């Protein structure tokens, strides 16, 4: 450590280098993006296809299956699911984490092209795809409402003007419009009028399509100029379509208005959006990857006044919900914890050193290390989020350790009579290796985590690198700036001290002397101390195995998602009234700020709600308590069920479900799946460890099954294609023509008027035109009867799948729920044709369960290797690592005491403890080895003196680390659920470890020294 003198003798250069580090950190801080959690870019692509009027089973067999066969051949697909409903199919592809999303998108487009020839010819457009991130919840929801404009007009303004402007804002990734559909001209046919006039549905469709064409007409050139030809070949409004002549009947023109009601309406009338129970069109905004959430929301808010100017004054554009408030509050809480941690750490130093000048040294080292870390975070592309700020909060107790060790040793020499400059040179060299060992071994803890693949590695990479960088900067500061400041600020001890300081020093001396006496007795009965060590190891293993576990702590983000489901035969109008009723009840809750909901689309028996809660400081109750209260209010509502779950900042898996966790049932036999799914669902619903159990299997929809008499059809001159075309024209909401406008394109939609299709008698009014042009009643060759039919068909891979979703009641961990599910499935005795497995977050939790122990063992092994290299010894690292069992025991006992399940956040706390508690042993072992080698001191006396000599810095560093994490334990504001497990783990582990390792480490050192000195067997040469 001779290089220390280079900095000690050049204080100006050292201070300027430190200033440069601080300035670069401040600059990086200003440019860092802000987010709730590290960016998790799940490579997911959704392929969408539509065939209006097609049944879910038809969509599954003719659209989903060809696409799945082509898409399933793409390399790197980890999960492929599809959902087919009335007229639409979505195939969701989740790729491996290391798969480039842009390359995957090119492969997806190629697969779609390859499957195109196998898809039905009547599809209005080619299948399309989009990149999505399932973990990205909406950052803002805007609403448009009006007393004078229709929902279709509001939707048109939103899609043609607002969506374009919003998409251009920096940071906006996706803008989705919901709550209605685009304007359209609707042709609602009167079957009886068609029959009376001798007009077929196909004739109406052909007439409309031929009357609205958009083709170039060319130009005429005369000698002087060119004349472009323009015709009135396009029709734009219902009024222009009504007088169209379809045919002449008995010498009179049969116009469209004679056989149909033609109105300016919307493409899909079964679509509704609401804001606080008032009709509204919804604008849902998501951010782009790597975007700063706060800055993006601020830019959107700044643009809102300009957006309002682009729409009529009678339209109210409001921001219904945005996520910035809870993110700001959560980050503010972490920043407060960070400030309190730094203050407590400095207070600990002052209490022990009893000198303002000495306290100033670590008081400078801590913020310099933390601020300098911001520069590295910016260069690494990180963000200011809960995890990175938690890393800095915890680091405030770590980075001071190096400065404390150096400062305490230099102060000891100053108190012994050396001049500050000499003390800085000598003291810095003495502990230089110790400081390097402490810091390098602490950073080594995170090497396995950084090498970890999958979600754990991606999620905690920012935390690990941020903490490692702050420790590395602290190491540099402690070996450069700290000795310089010690040489300039410390003063030789005054002969007289103030009574207050003398009293504290005397108290510390008494404690140290008491520790010395106790250590003597422990060393005299070393076997008992070793037994305590072994017992703590056994108890740690037992606690880890029996501890309730979960994936991530349940967060209170101030946002809830509600899913409403009614009977599968529920009509759109009935469902709309139910959704409005649920929204009124939810909005009346004192904790709810606003409610935005929608229903409709192709599934008329379901709806959804986005619920924004009031600030936590205002509502008092956490999200789970609000959910429990609303659940009890709405439990007895007839005809529909509402499922609620708290929105989480991280969501794994692209599969949509009503609950936060999923269990999937797969089978190659759809009949077996439909037979066993209700049994398993009932079994899950009876488990006290689960709530809100639901299934996405909807196979009880009302269907009218038509049976054709093909012999009679042949005799009448009718083809099956003609009949299916008739049914599609009548009931398929068929888009038969396109209206082109400057800003958008709109559709002409044809179908039987709802007044004539309210019951099954509508089929009796259907007539098919045969090959001779004669109208033939549908009932003359077809019969029909009601039956059950699926509202949607789900696939995973190429197998039928049904997903059971569930939530957890308060106080139940995911491991307890998973164990209950496994027991229930075993008890049911499912056949081999039905396979069950967890999906989404629950599946990742199962995978991480097996990797957690290996991650801890890998961290211990890495630290052992690093320490072995530093000490050039196989034995001494074992002495240092002997501190770990007591720390693990304390951490797990603390989690049990606070009724907190073991999560990934607690796992990070365990890894941190591996790095923290060994510092105490390092300080003891270093000085004991030095005393043995340089002074020839006996091993027992060496470790005894080392323990006494390093007692003060050990207590100081442990208290600093403990108090640095204490604000995390005591936090109660926004985001506290994420911070508390980390603080509880660290504080609990440090308390127990401090009480035990001060005694067990010297004992282990003695036994290891005996092991090292044990005579080895050597071959005896043969005597001649």
Curated annotation (Swiss-Prot):
For this protein, the parts annotated as crossing the membrane are 3-23, 333-353, 360-380, 387-407, 431-451, 463-483, 528-548, 853-873, 875-895, 897-917, 953-973, 984-1004
Keyword Cell inner membrane assigned? yes
Q: Could you tell me which Gene3D superfamilies the record lists for this protein?
A: Multidrug efflux transporter AcrB pore domain (3.30.70.1440), Multidrug efflux transporter AcrB pore domain like (3.30.70.1320), Multidrug efflux transporter AcrB TolC docking domain, DN and DC subdomains (3.30.2090.10), Multidrug efflux transporter AcrB transmembrane domain (1.20.1640.10)
Q: Kindly give the Pfam families that the UniProt entry links to this protein.
A: ACR_tran
Membrane topology classification: Multi-pass membrane protein
A GO MF label: xenobiotic transmembrane transporter activity
The listed locations are: Cell inner membrane
Q: Which GO terms describe its cellular component?
A: plasma membrane
Name the domain of life this protein comes from: Bacteria
Keyword ATP-binding tagged: no
Which family is annotated? Belongs to the resistance-nodulation-cell division (RND) (TC 2.A.6) family. MdtC subfamily.
Descriptive protein name? Multidrug resistance protein MdtC
Source gene? mdtC
């Amino acid at each position: 450590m001779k290089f220390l003198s280079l900095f000690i003798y050049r204080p100006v250069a050292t201070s300027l280098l430190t200033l440069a580090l601080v300035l670069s950190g401040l600059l990086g801080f200003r440019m860092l993006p802000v987010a709730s959690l590290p960016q998790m870019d799940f490579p997911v692509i959704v392929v969408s296809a539509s065939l209006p009027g097609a049944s879910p089973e038809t969509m599954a067999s003719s659209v989903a299956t060809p696409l799945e066969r082509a898409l399933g051949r793409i390399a790197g697909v980890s999960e492929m699911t599809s959902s087919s409903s009335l007229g639409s199919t979505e195939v969701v592809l989740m790729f491996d984490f290391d798969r480039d999303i842009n390359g995957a998108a090119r492969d997806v487009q190629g697969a779609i092209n390859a499957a195109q020839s196998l898809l039905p010819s009547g599809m209005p457009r080619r299948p399309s795809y989009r990149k999505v991130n399932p973990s990205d919840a909406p950052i803002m929801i805007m609403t448009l409402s009006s007393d004078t404009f229709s929902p279709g007009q509001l939707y048109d303004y939103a899609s043609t003007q607002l969506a374009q402007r919003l998409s251009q804002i920096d940071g906006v990734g996706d803008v989705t419009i919901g709550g209605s559909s685009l304007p359209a001209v609707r042709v609602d046919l009167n079957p009886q009028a068609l029959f009376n006039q001798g007009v077929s549905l196909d004739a109406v469709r052909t007439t409309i399509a031929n009357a609205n064409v958009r083709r170039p007409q060319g130009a005429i050139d005369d000698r002087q100029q060119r004349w472009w030809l323009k015709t009135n070949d396009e029709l734009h409004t219902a009024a222009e379509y009504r007088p169209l002549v379809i045919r002449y009947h008995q010498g009179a023109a049969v116009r469209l208005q004679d056989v149909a009601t033609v109105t300016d309406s919307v493409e899909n009338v079964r679509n509704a959006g609401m804001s606080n129970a008032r009709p509204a069109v919804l604008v849902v905004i998501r951010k782009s990857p790597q975007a700063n959430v706060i800055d993006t929301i601020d830019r959107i808010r700044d643009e809102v006044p300009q957006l309002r100017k682009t729409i009529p004054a009678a339209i109210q554009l409001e921001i219904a919900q945005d996520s910035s408030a809870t993110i700001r509050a959560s980050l503010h809480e972490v920043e407060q914890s960070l400030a309190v941690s730094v203050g407590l750490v400095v207070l600990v130093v002052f209490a022990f050193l009893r000198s303002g000048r000495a306290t100033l040294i670590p008081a400078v080292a801590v913020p310099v290390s933390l601020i300098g870390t911001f520069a590295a975070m910016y260069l690494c592309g990180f963000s200011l989020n809960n995890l990175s700020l938690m890393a800095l909060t915890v680091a405030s107790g770590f980075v001071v350790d190096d400065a404390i060790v150096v400062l305490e040793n230099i102060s000891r020499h100053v108190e012994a009579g050396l001049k500050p400059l000499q003390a800085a040179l000598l003291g810095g060299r003495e502990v230089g290796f110790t400081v390097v060992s402490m810091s390098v071994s602490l950073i080594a803890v995170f090497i396995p985590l950084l090498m970890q693949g999958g979600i754990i590695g991606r999620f905690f990479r920012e935390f690990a690198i941020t903490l490692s960088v702050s420790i590395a900067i602290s190491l540099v500061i402690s070996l450069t700036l700290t000795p310089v400041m010690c040489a300039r600020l410390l003063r030789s001890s005054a002969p007289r001290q103030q009574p207050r300081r003398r009293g504290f020093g005397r108290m510390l001396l008494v404690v140290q002397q008491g520790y010395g006496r106790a250590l003597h007795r422990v060393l005299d009965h070393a076997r008992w101390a070793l037994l305590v060590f072994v017992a703590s190891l056994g108890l740690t293993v037992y606690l880890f195995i029996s501890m309730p576990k979960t994936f991530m702590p349940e967060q209170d983000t101030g946002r809830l998602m509600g899913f409403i489901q009614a009977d599968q035969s529920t009509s759109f109008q009935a469902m709309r009234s139910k959704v409005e009723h649920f929204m009124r009840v939810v909005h009346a809750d004192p904790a709810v700020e606003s409610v935005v909901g929608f229903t409709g689309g192709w599934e008329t028996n379901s709806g959804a709600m986005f619920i924004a809660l009031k600030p936590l400081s205002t509502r008092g109750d956490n999200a789970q308590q609000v959910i429990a209260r609303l659940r009890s209010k709405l439990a007895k509502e007839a005809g529909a069920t509402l499922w609620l779950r708290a929105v989480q900042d991280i969501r794994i898996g692209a599969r949509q479900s009503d609950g936060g966790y999923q269990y999937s049932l797969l089978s190659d036999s759809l009949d077996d799946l439909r037979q066993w799914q209700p049994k398993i669902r009932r079994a899950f619903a009876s488990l006290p460890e689960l709530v809100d159990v639901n299934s996405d299997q909807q196979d009880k929809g009302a269907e009218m099954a038509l049976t054709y008499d093909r012999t009679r059809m042949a005799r009448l001159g009718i083809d099956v294609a003609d009949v299916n075309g008739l049914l599609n024209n009548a009931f398929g909401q068929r888009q038969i023509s396109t209206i082109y406008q400057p800003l958008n394109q709109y559709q002409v939609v044809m179908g039987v008027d709802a007044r004539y299709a309210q019951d099954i008698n509508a089929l009796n009014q259907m007539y098919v035109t045969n090959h001779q042009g004669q109208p033939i009643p549908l009932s003359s060759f077809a019969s029909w009867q009601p039956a059950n039919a699926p509202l949607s068909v789900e696939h995973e891979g190429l197998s039928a799948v049904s997903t059971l979703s569930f939530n957890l009641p308060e106080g139940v961990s995911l491991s307890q729920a998973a164990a209950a599910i496994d027991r229930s499935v075993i008890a049911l005795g499912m056949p081999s044709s039905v396979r069950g497995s967890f999906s989404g977050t629950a599946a990742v939790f199962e995978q991480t369960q097996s990797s957690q122990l290996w991650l801890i063992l890998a961290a211990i092994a890495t630290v052992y290797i690093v320490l072995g290299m530093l000490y050039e010894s196989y034995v001494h690292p074992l002495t240092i690592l002997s501190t770990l069992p007591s720390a693990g025991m304390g951490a797990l006992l603390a989690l049990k005491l606070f009724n907190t399940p073991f999560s990934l956040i607690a796992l990070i706390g365990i890894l941190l403890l591996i790095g923290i508690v060994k510092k105490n042993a390092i300080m003891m072992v270093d000085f004991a080895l030095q005393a043995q080698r340089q002074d020839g001191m006996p091993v027992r006396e060496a470790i005894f003196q080392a323990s006494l000599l390093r007692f003060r810095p050990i207590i100081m560093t442990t208290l600093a680390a403990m108090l640095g994490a204490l604000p995390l334990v005591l936090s109660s504001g926004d985001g506290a659920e994420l911070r508390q497990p980390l603080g509880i783990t660290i504080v609990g582990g440090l308390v127990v470890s401090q009480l035990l390792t001060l005694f067990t480490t010297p004992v282990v050192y003695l036994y290891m020294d005996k092991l090292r000195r044990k005579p080895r067997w050597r071959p005896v040469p043969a005597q001649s």
